[in-house]
UniProtKB/Swiss-Prot annotation:
This is Envelopment polyprotein. Changing residue 615 to A: Complete loss of interaction with host MAP1LC3B. It comes from Hantaan virus (strain 76-118) (Korean hemorrhagic fever virus). Residues 516-533, 588-605, 592-603, 611-625, 1122-1135 are annotated as: Binding to the ribonucleoprotein. Disulfide bonds join 29-151, 63-157, 109-128, 133-138, 175-185, 210-247, 234-351, 376-435, 380-389, 405-424, 452-475, 735-770, 739-777, 751-885, 765-896, 780-904, 806-815, 823-832, 863-867, 970-1000, 993-1045, 1010-1015, 1046-1051, 1085-1089. The record marks 648-649 as: Cleavage. The lineage of its organism: Viruses, Riboviria, Orthornavirae, Negarnaviricota, Polyploviricotina.
Length: 1135
């Protein structure tokens, strides 16, 4: 059993251990494959492996794209290592020595000339690795460069390197061709170097990876450019290493060749490589706090067979953070150096005995522009108990969320549009989706209508055309649908249902009448018995038998007891009983004729006759009469038609449109007309009336006031880009020499701070192999790496809330943009914004984590001058300044233990400001934006959520000259052009109207979308002389509605029918387009309007499909036949 136990345990543990060695490499692909030799790159840092195992490592790929064969060749490296001398017991400059040997490494990133270009044309990948090593182990970094076509060909594949397996995952971003930075799509533009157009072009920090390519030639003498560009004393540049760096910017670009004088990107990378040659560190997670000991400076022979030392290095022990692969500079031939546990000299102020990095990673600042943000289209269909939705955007979706749906972060793509699928679990309320900064509302009522239509059509699939025509009427939500069902059922089956339902009602009524009659007879008998008993007790005495003690109801019964009980007989059945009270009482309980005296009395009481109007009348009612059935049938059809028409128009909540009849309301101007109300920032407001002369009603003037939605405009100061970064605390210790003697790798980081503890005088702060007190140095270094831009910040200087107000008063047409505490004033009308309730204030900072169209956060406290690490705005890159580093206010402490290496401790904050904000993001105020316009100095947008409110006051004076202003010469002609959408109360329809204006240059008015009875929507529009195209959106109507374009009481002669609501996808409505308050005072639909609407519906339902009428008449005939069978006409015989 023991061996089986271990085998089972091994089978359980082995898959877990195998999975632990699988790591992900993400390759970010653009949305579309652009022209040009673009390549994409990805890399991943892997855990350490023993130094001895590096000689056998080689990348092995299972990807269907072949790896470039030249990487499989063996590259000879000079391995430089250090070791302590056996005769030295204490650390000093002479206590160690370097050893140079030749090793063969296969698969390192030694790229050949034209390799990347050839791999693009031959559709091959370039897979290689870098090594960061100390004296015992190495941390590999795996790189993969593939042509951009791989984004369309592959989804994932697997690469093996040593003991590790790397899953390569291709992820598409929503960027068309650009690089995803700060949630925005940045396109580097090398043609823009010095002139940055405000609001169009910007400067962004972009990640870059460079590989050295060794090639000989006069044009590849890289150190000639080093000598020109930097203050270098490099001599004999003719005999220095020759070649160039090939770089990929942002993970997705065409190759950039470094140095290239006419390419700004190339020179930025060239500057970064030689000013910060170590580049980004290769620390893994958890290695932010580490230490290493400096052993001392050393020289080595490269190659190992050289007669003299050719390379300077610094030996160390501890966690390796930087690449151990480099290229010797003192030879035109590329001499590859592998230096585990040593920092090669990469400073080229003096080019003697130096090297250059084989692979360099870092960040460079590039000019470019951001891709435009495209609006979203959201569709939904009913799926099970919920809805299945899709979101599309031509230019990609940068952000999509929903408070009531399950939106996956894994994006899928279809052709040139990005498609994101998600599921909404409930459809009992409208679905709200935020997509690309827009608030979309999907009206789920239409989805339910579609499912209802689909179900009814499926049940009556033998006649699908008829079933669909009837289903679209039955499935209208609310009382209207039930009224329609009742109307159709009454028409088709009323001749059977009316007598059947009447019979049921009569049966119930007769049953109730019978119950009441029986109850009354019993109560009358009980009353008689009670009176007899009371009278007997008053005159004769008790009615209780002396023998059996039974209480009698009548004197005759008492007399019978007096005769039979003494003789031991039952007075009712004359059965013999024991002459005891208990025996008699027990017998009476089982005796069957104890009620015979009561029955005799009941016969003597005269029964009460039925009244003619109750039970007898119910029995004689002729519910089978054809006259009664026909009368009820007609009455129900008329009543249900009125109820149907009354329920056909829905009254939604404001600020959405309210259905009303034709026309415009009128106001007699006895006094000044004043309106005072609060209006949300996302709402438009339209007020339209006829102002009439109170002395003569025939004189009137048209008043039309249009107030557009609020525009928020802020003058800002662009603070720049906010960065996230990782703070590293490193301890560098060496036994001898001053702290300035060695150059530490963090010196080339953009943000670093160092505290030195030099020449210690305590034995407790020196390891056992140090020479003693008063020597050496402990350097404590703080530096930031893995910098990543996360957002753009803008400080509000001034803020302005404004609305555009237009007034049409008779012939007068005036418009003005008014601010808070400002007024529009004309001769007769005054419109003022008295105040605004807002969450913005001067001095706030607006932070955008992505495109400005997606909204942002409001910061009341944002550091701009003295920033500490961890504050909002701690790491900034302003456009007009250099990189701004934060302060590190914490203090250092050197922790000492006897005979051990000192360790640096830092008591300050180690968490970046960005990570702190994300951890508490719910505590910050957010805002959404739409209709965004921005430059570096000003941002304007509209609030789609209506979170702000304006207090508005409108005053119209009563002093109007009706005699001179009453005549309006403007003439309007109407024509209905086309219609889109569906009738009903779902998403609605859009009516296209051709409106002609003559006799005046401009005219502000409203065009309505109406049928014969009711108007369902309106659009306020400023007409110009000539032909105008106006689109009017509305909701409502029925299958018979013929929608026309109307102006007041005048409508176009020809109307159009809208489609029926069905199971098609429901398109989301932009909230900013749907939020408006329209008030023209038109009357509500009355009784006459109801009859007009019913007639239009009845004519409409039959005009388009005559077979529906035929089918309904067939059902009517069937019900008549069924009535004649079940209820035949009663024949009367002649006497």
């Amino acid at each position: 059993m023991g061996i089986w136990k271990w085998l089972v345990m091994a089978s359980l543990v082995w898959p877990v251990l195998t999975l632990r060695n699988v790591y992900d490499m993400k390759i970010e692909c653009p949305h579309t494959v652009s022209f040009g030799e673009n390549s994409v790159i990805g890399y991943v840092e892997l855990p350490p492996v023993p130094l001895a195992d590096t000689a056998q490592m080689v990348p092995e790929s299972s990807c269907n794209m072949d790896n470039h064969q030249s990487l499989n060749t063996i590259t000879k490296y000079t391995q430089v290592s250090w070791r302590g001398k056996a005769d030295q017991s204490q650390s000093s400059q002479n206590s160690f020595e370097t050893v140079s040997t030749e090793v063969d490494l296969k698969g390192t990133c030694v790229l050949k000339h034209k390799m990347v270009e050839e791999s693009y044309r031959s559709r091959k990948s370039v897979t290689c690795y870098d090594l960061s090593c100390n004296s015992t182990y190495c941390k590999p970094t795996l790189y993969m460069i593939v042509p951009i076509h791989a984004c369309n060909m592959m989804k994932s594949c697997l690469i093996a390197l040593g003991p590790y397996r790397v899953q390569v995952v291709y992820e598409r971003s929503y960027c068309m061709t650009g690089v995803l930075i700060e949630g925005k799509c940045f396109v580097p533009d090398q043609s823009v170097v010095s002139i940055i157009k405000h609001g169009i072009f910007d400067i962004a920090s972009v990640h870059i990876v460079c590989f050295f390519v060794a090639v000989k030639g006069n044009t590849y003498k890289i150190f000639e450019q080093v000598k020109k560009s930097f203050e270098s004393t490099c001599n004999d540049t003719e005999n220095k290493v020759q070649g160039y760096y090939i770089c990929i910017v942002g993970g997705n670009s065409a190759p950039i060749y470094v140095p290239t004088l006419d390419d700004f990107r190339s020179m930025e990378a060239f500057t970064g490589i030689f000013r910060s040659p170590h580049g980004e560190d290769h620390d893994l997670a958890g290695e932010e706090i580490a230490s290493y000991s400096i052993v001392g400076p050393a020289n080595a022979k490269v190659p190992h067979s050289a007669s003299s030392d050719t390379l300077s290095l610094i030996a160390y022990s501890g966690i390796p953070s930087y690449s151990s692969l480099s290229i010797l500079t003192s030879s035109t031939e590329a001499k590859h150096v592998f230096s585990p546990g040593l920092f090669p000299k990469l400073n080229h102020t003096n080019c003697d005995k130096s090297a250059i990095p084989l692979i360099w990673t870092g960040m460079i600042d590039l000019p470019g522009y951001y891709e435009a943000v495209h609006p979203c289209t959201v569709f939904c269909v009913l799926s099970g108990p919920g809805a299945s939705c899709e979101a599309f955007s031509e230019g990609g979706i940068f952000n999509i969320t929903s408070p009531m749906c399950l939106v996956s972060k894994q994006n899928r793509f279809r052709l040139t549009e990005q498609q994101v699928n998600f599921v909404c679990q409930r459809v009992d309320m409208d679905i709200v989706v935020y997509c690309n900064g827009q608030r979309k509302v999907i009206l789920t009522k239409t989805l339910v209508i579609g499912q209802c239509i689909y179900t009814i059509t499926s049940l009556f699939s033998l006649l699908p055309g008829v079933a669909h025509s009837i289903a679209v009427e039955l499935c209208v939500p609310g009382f209207h649908g039930w009224a329609t069902a009742a109307l159709l059922v009454t028409f088709c089956f009323g001749w059977v249902l009316i007598p059947a339902i009447t019979f049921i009602i009569l049966t119930v009524l007769k049953f109730i009448a019978n119950i009441f009659h029986t109850s009354n007879q019993e109560n009358r008998l009980k009353s008689v018995l009670r009176k007899i008993k009371e009278e007997f007790e008053k005159t004769k005495g008790s009615m209780v038998c002396d023998v059996c003690k039974y209480e009698c109801e009548t004197y005759k019964e008492l007399k019978a007891h007096g005769v039979s009980c003494p003789q031991s007989q039952c007075p009712y059945c004359f059965t013999h009983c024991e002459p005891t009270e208990a025996a008699f009482q027990a017998h009476y309980k089982v005796c069957q004729v104890t009620h015979r005296f009561r029955d005799d009395l009941k016969k003597t009481v005269t029964p009460q006759n039925f009244t003619p109007g109750c039970y007898r009348t119910l029995n004689l009612f002729r519910y089978k009469s054809r006259c009664y059935i026909f009368t009820m049938w007609i009455f129900l059809l008329v009543l249900e038609s009125i109820l149907w028409a009354a329920s056909a128009s829905e009254t939604p909540l404001t600020p959405v449109w309210n259905d009303n009849a034709h026309g415009v309301g009128s106001v007699p101007m006895h006094t000044d007309l004043e309106l005072d109300f609060s209006l949300t920032s996302s709402s438009k407001y339209t007020y339209r009336r006829k102002l009439t002369n109170p002395l003569e009603e025939a004189q009137s003037i048209d008043l039309h006031i249009e107030i557009e939605e609020q525009t928020i405009g802020v003058d800002v100061h662009a603070l720049g880009h906010w960065f996230d970064g990782r703070l590293n605390l490193k301890t560098s210790f060496h036994c001898y020499g001053a702290c300035t003697k060695y150059e530490y790798p963090w010196h080339t980081a953009k943000c670093h701070y160092e505290r030195d503890y030099q020449y210690e005088t305590s034995w407790g702060c020196n390891p056992s192999d140090c020479p003693g007190v008063g020597t050496g140095c402990t350097a404590c270094g703080l530096y930031l790496d893995q910098l990543k831009p996360v957002g753009s910040a803008y400080k509000i200087i001034t803020i302005r809330y404004s609305r555009r107000v237009c007034v049409q008063f008779g012939e007068e047409n005036l418009c003005k943009i008014i601010d808070m505490n400002d007024c529009f004033v004309s001769r007769h009308v005054k419109v003022c914004i008295i105040g605004t309730v807002s969450k913005f204030s001067q001095g706030d900072t607006l932070l955008f984590f992505g495109p400005l169209e997606g909204g942002g956060l409001i910061f009341k406290h944002w550091c701009t001058s003295t920033c500490q690490f961890g504050d909002p705005g701690d790491i900034m890159s302003p456009r007009d300044k250099g990189f701004l580093c934060p302060e590190f206010p914490g203090s250092f402490r050197k922790k000492c233990n006897f005979a051990t290496t000192p360790i640096c401790e830092y008591d300050g904050n180690m968490v970046s400001g960005y990570k702190k904000v994300m951890a508490t993001i719910d505590s910050f105020q957010s805002f959404n934006t739409s209709t965004m316009h921005f430059t570096d100095e000003r941002i304007e947008w509209k609030d789609p959520d209506g979170m702000l409110r304006d207090h508005i006051n409108i005053l119209v004076t009563k002093d109007i000259d009706f005699d001179n202003l009453g005549e309006n010469p403007c003439k309007i002609g109407l024509q209905t052009s086309s219609i889109e959408g569906a009738w009903g109360s779902g998403v609605g329809f859009t009516l296209t109207c051709l409106v002609s204006l003559t006799e005046c240059p401009t005219f502000l008015t409203s065009i309505k979308a109406c049928d014969k009875a009711i108007c369902y929507g309106a659009e306020s529009v400023t007409l110009t002389r000539g032909q105008n195209t106006v689109k009017v959106s509305g909701k409502g109507g029925h299958s018979g509605s013929t929608f026309r374009c109307c102006h007041g009481e005048d409508c176009s002669q020809i109307g159009l029918h809208a489609a029926a609501p069905h199971l098609d996808k429901v398109n989301g409505i932009s909230e900013i387009e749907n939020s408006k308050v329209y008030d023209d005072g038109a009357p509500q639909c009355g009784i006459k309007c109801w009859f007009v609407k019913s007639g239009e519906w009845i004519s409409g339902i039959f005009s388009g499909n005559w077979i529906v009428l035929i089918v309904l008449c067939v059902f009517l005939l069937f019900s008549l036949v069924l009535l004649s069978i079940l209820c035949p006409v009663r024949k009367h015989k002649k006497s």
